[in-house]
Amino acid sequence: MSHRRQTAQEGGQMEGQAACFAREAPAVAVDLLGAHLQVRGVGGRIVETEAYTPDDPASHSFRGPTPRNAAMFGPPGCAYVYLSYGIHLCLNVVCAPGHAVLIRALEPTEGLAQMAARRGTDVARLLCSGPGRIGQALGLTLADDGTAFGTRGFAVRWGAPVAAGEILCGPRIGISRAADMPWRFGLRGSPCLSRRF
């Protein structure tokens, strides 16, 4: 059952928004499909996610809290931003303690010109088709780590739940542990998926 709710872009319904995220990551990862994510006026529709849990060997939270992953153990509904391979900034939404959802792809809807300038391409389907591309297109920095959605220009706008038949599911990408877990989710037919299912 979906726990989606209409939430304010800034402030207002912070408690309700946090409750939407205070669940296990696989459930939140599915519910986030079709929602709109915005960071400082730039964003789009979420079309691909991956779930990570504290008992998951592929998760940053698997060995417990560290200075790097502290946000994963913080309040639900916050951003966990980390540097991947020393190059790409990746955006996750924190759920229950130690749970997070990696945002893998967006269909850009807001701030396309700014995204294109940051990414060096104006091909819409390539602007946010992958976690590293999202980080670049949204202008993320490590200072964004721990930011609560609903503050500092970060927002998730929930829409109507996506029909089960429109949701794709498969193994996660780019990991060597627990690679068979079917915790990658996507919207069927989206041209902006990072990779085919």
Curated annotation (Swiss-Prot):
Its EC number(s): 3.2.2.-
Family in the record: Belongs to the DNA glycosylase MPG family.
Entry's Gene Ontology BP terms: base-excision repair
Any one GO molecular-function label of the UniProt entry: alkylbase DNA N-glycosylase activity
Protein name, entry field: Putative 3-methyladenine DNA glycosylase
Matches recorded under InterPro entries: Formyl_transferase-like_C_sf, MPG, MPG_sf
Transmembrane segments annotated in the record for this chain: none
Record's keyword terms, sorted: DNA damage, DNA repair, Hydrolase
